[in-house]
């Protein structure tokens, strides 16, 4: 068999658009025959799938699963190209499968997840006909007493995963605590909290905010020493905007979320702590390609 060189792999990738490892395998399977390797990739649907990977996948859905008595949960974002596909049964089933693989395999990274999934996503690309990407995921598992809760809003547009720790397993199982989890998830989804408490905000983020607030005060005509004093008050307002426990509760603006947690803890007779949360919004940060109308018409007519 001919030696498979890096140059051969690179040339096959350039011609087919397939992944590096797929190209290497194709060459190995065909004894280094370039044309046969191209055919092998096409037969496996890998060349077509790889070409689709060049298209922007900014639609999709955020999906969640919580199991094991609310002790183990997953939040995952899977992207595709169109809303039509995102609402289809095949894509929803794929999202659910990906989430269950995360629960079972406990991958530490996207690379590890892709390995655990095998050819599942590539097969879905070939079947559905769109670029599909598993973009990100988070997995929470309760170590002691506590519970995990997930909330999905608007057909998978926004998703939240939150973990609470509690004084005892009995407190975690209390209906009031389950209801609290849901209220907190709704709060995070709607008010876009970024951190649990002020202590969780990185020092560089606080310093950056201080610099901005000080510059704002000076631009308002305040002297530097006065501006410094103003920053102290304004940074507290910043915490109230980005920290979950400092936010006003959306259902009662006279009460902070932190006060709500303490109130429920008093009712159930045990300490409750918000350990962590994550909020995903479908497609956030993905730059969508802007097509003009003429290009769209040509594409739909099969001319482009």
UniProtKB/Swiss-Prot annotation:
Pfam families: EF_TS
Subcellular location: Cytoplasm
GO cellular component: cytoplasm
Key words of the record: Cytoplasm, Elongation factor, Protein biosynthesis
GO terms of molecular function: translation elongation factor activity
PROSITE patterns, per the entry: EF_TS_1 (PS01126), EF_TS_2 (PS01127)
Start and end residues of each stretch annotated as Involved in Mg(2+) ion dislocation from EF-Tu: 82-85
Domain of life: Bacteria
InterPro entries for this protein: EF-Ts_dimer_sf, Transl_elong_EFTs/EF1B, Transl_elong_EFTs/EF1B_dimer, Transl_elong_Ts_CS, UBA-like_sf
Free-text function comment from the UniProt entry: Associates with the EF-Tu.GDP complex and induces the exchange of GDP to GTP. It remains bound to the aminoacyl-tRNA.EF-Tu.GTP complex up to the GTP hydrolysis stage on the ribosome.
HAMAP family on file: EF_Ts
Family membership: Belongs to the EF-Ts family.
Protein name stated in the entry: Elongation factor Ts
Source organism per UniProt: Symbiobacterium thermophilum (strain DSM 24528 / JCM 14929 / IAM 14863 / T)
Gene name of the encoded protein: tsf
């Amino acid at each position: 068999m001919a030696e498979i060189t890096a140059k051969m792999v690179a040339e096959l990738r350039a011609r087919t658009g397939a992944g590096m490892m797929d190209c290497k395998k194709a060459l190995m399977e065909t004894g280094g025959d370039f044309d046969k390797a191209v055919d092998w990739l096409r037969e496996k649907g890998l060349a077509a799938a790889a070409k689709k990977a060049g298209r922007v996948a900014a639609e999709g859905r955020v999906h969640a699963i919580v199991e094991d008595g609310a002790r183990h949960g997953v939040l995952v974002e899977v992207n595709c190209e169109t809303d039509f596909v995102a609402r289809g049964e095949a894509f929803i089933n794929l999202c659910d499968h990906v989430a269950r693989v995360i629960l079972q395999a406990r991958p530490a990274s996207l690379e590890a997840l892709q390995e655990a999934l095998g050819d599942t996503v590539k097969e879905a690309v070939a079947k559905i006909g769109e670029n599909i990407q598993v973009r990100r995921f988070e997995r929470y598992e309760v170590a002691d007493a506590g519970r995990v809760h997930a909330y999905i809003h608007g057909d998978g547009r926004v998703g939240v995963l939150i973990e609470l720790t509690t004084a005892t397993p009995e407190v975690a199982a209390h209906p009031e605590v389950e209801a609290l989890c849901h209220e907190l998830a709704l709060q995070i989804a709607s008010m876009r909290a970024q951190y649990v408490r002020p202590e969780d905000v990185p020092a560089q983020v606080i310093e950056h905010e201080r610099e901005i607030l000080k510059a704002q005060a000076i631009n308002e005509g305040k002297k530097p020493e006065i501006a410094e004093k103003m920053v102290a008050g304004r940074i507290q307002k910043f915490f109230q905007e980005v920290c979950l426990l400092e936010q006003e509760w959306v259902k009662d603006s006279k009460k902070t979320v932190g006060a709500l947690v303490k109130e429920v803890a008093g009712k159930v007779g045990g300490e409750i702590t918000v350990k962590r949360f994550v909020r995903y919004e479908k497609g956030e940060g993905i730059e969508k390609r802007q097509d003009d109308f003429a290009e769209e018409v040509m594409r739909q007519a099969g001319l482009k």
